[in-house]
Amino acid sequence: MTNIRKSXPLMKIINSSFIDLPAPSNISSWWNFGSLLGICLALQILTGLFLAMHYTSDTATAFNSVTHICRDVNYGWVLRYLHANGASMFFICLYLHVGRGIYYGSYMYTETWNVGVILLFAVMATAFMGYVLPWGQMSFWGATVITNLLSAIPYIGTNLVKWIWGGFSVDKATLTRFFAFHFLLPFVISAMVMVHLLFLHETGSNNPTGIPSNMDMIPFHPYYTIKDILGLLLMITVLLMLVLFSPDMLGDPDNYMPANPLNTPPHIKPEWYFLFAYAILRSIPNKLGGVLALVLSILILIIIPLLHTSKQRSMTFRPLSQCLFWLLVADLFTLTWIGGQPVEHPYVIIGQLASILYFSIIXILMPXISFAENHLLKW
């Protein structure tokens, strides 16, 4: 008799995706983050669903409804902090996942990579709208500043901003629509994840050497299911330590003050995971230029496959490219730090230099060094 997992139509899909999937025998822990991201997404949807049962998307009651969740709902505080810190874990895994893709040349699977970049944009949009929902000071002013950037778009900008606001400022209509989109987008993201996996399973996984591993494959289960469970346990441990010991460590104290349009906070800044892009935005004195740089800081990922000049796919055997990659990582940490600092000397000039370096490494230095390494191979 045929095994049910190989005959039932639904089980066949699950079997070919998670059980009998041929996987390279040498993929390292850097390949764990895909499954961790899937778990993060499931966690966010679940906690978000339960939070939405108690939340009200009205300017008069939003802040109080979040307070009510924390004080009066059974384990509401756990739900709220799991959701808030779950977003941080989501972005940590996302950035490590993208970093792995750049280091090991996974971007050569262009369809998978491009869907991944669109996913990154979708997750960033969802997180931004979620930050507005508690209707604290930083929620209100963050929404005002970031949506106002769209007014830099020539000709249609001002009308576009009013259309997004649903009025002449961030108000009741804005909060309601942000809640609607924040609820909807994770399900769109889930569908896009399926497309991401569909494209990935067309080619199979890359591996640390960057050499095709068709000769040496092993089944996904039990080898990588066990490995993924270990990664999951480590991530859940870090998340629970955050939630139970210092739930507000990554948040902004200003968000514990109800939104007040008459009182601007001294330093308006987004959540930590957007600080690098915020620093790039602020480092350009021109509004439209800043907005373009902000969008390009993520959109530049799309052209990375076109900039690949090396004869080798992975950076495993390319020490010069490795140096550049880690310089890029250090640069992103610098930008994240600058994004959280006030706009004054010396932070402005450091931010500008770090922004120039960011675009230079990706667009100029990496292709050139890869080209040079090709010639070094002949020595």
Swiss-Prot record:
Gene that specifies this protein: MT-CYB
Residues the entry annotates as binding heme b b566: 97, 196
Molecular functions (GO terms): metal ion binding; ubiquinol-cytochrome-c reductase activity
Cofactor remark from the record: Binds 2 heme b groups non-covalently.
Note: Heme 1 (or BL or b562) is low-potential and absorbs at about 562 nm, and heme 2 (or BH or b566) is high-potential and absorbs at about 566 nm.
Pfam families cross-referenced by the UniProt entry: Cytochrom_B_C, Cytochrome_B
Protein known as: Cytochrome b
Record localization: Mitochondrion inner membrane
Record-linked InterPro entries: Cyt_b/b6_C, Cyt_b/b6_C_sf, Cyt_b/b6_N, Cytb/b6-like_sf, Cytochrome_b, Cytochrome_b_C_euk/bac, Cytochrome_b_N_euk/bac, Di-haem_cyt_TM
Organism: Myotis oxygnathus (Lesser mouse-eared bat)
Lineage: Eukaryota, Metazoa, Chordata, Craniata, Vertebrata
Function: Component of the ubiquinol-cytochrome c reductase complex (complex III or cytochrome b-c1 complex) that is part of the mitochondrial respiratory chain. The b-c1 complex mediates electron transfer from ubiquinol to cytochrome c. Contributes to the generation of a proton gradient across the mitochondrial membrane that is then used for ATP synthesis.
Family membership: Belongs to the cytochrome b family.
Keyword entries, A-Z: Electron transport, Heme, Iron, Membrane, Metal-binding, Mitochondrion, Mitochondrion inner membrane, Respiratory chain, Transmembrane, Transmembrane helix, Transport, Ubiquinone
Binding site for a ubiquinone: 201
One Gene Ontology CC term in the entry: mitochondrial inner membrane
Membrane topology reported for the UniProt record: Multi-pass membrane protein
GO biological process, one term: mitochondrial electron transport, ubiquinol to cytochrome c
Binding site for heme b b562: 83, 182
Cofactor(s) this protein requires: heme b
Membrane spanning stretches: 33-53, 77-98, 113-133, 178-198, 226-246, 288-308, 320-340, 347-367
PANTHER family: CYTOCHROME B (PTHR19271:SF16)
Subunit-level organization: The cytochrome bc1 complex contains 11 subunits: 3 respiratory subunits (MT-CYB, CYC1 and UQCRFS1), 2 core proteins (UQCRC1 and UQCRC2) and 6 low-molecular weight proteins (UQCRH/QCR6, UQCRB/QCR7, UQCRQ/QCR8, UQCR10/QCR9, UQCR11/QCR10 and a cleavage product of UQCRFS1). This cytochrome bc1 complex then forms a dimer.
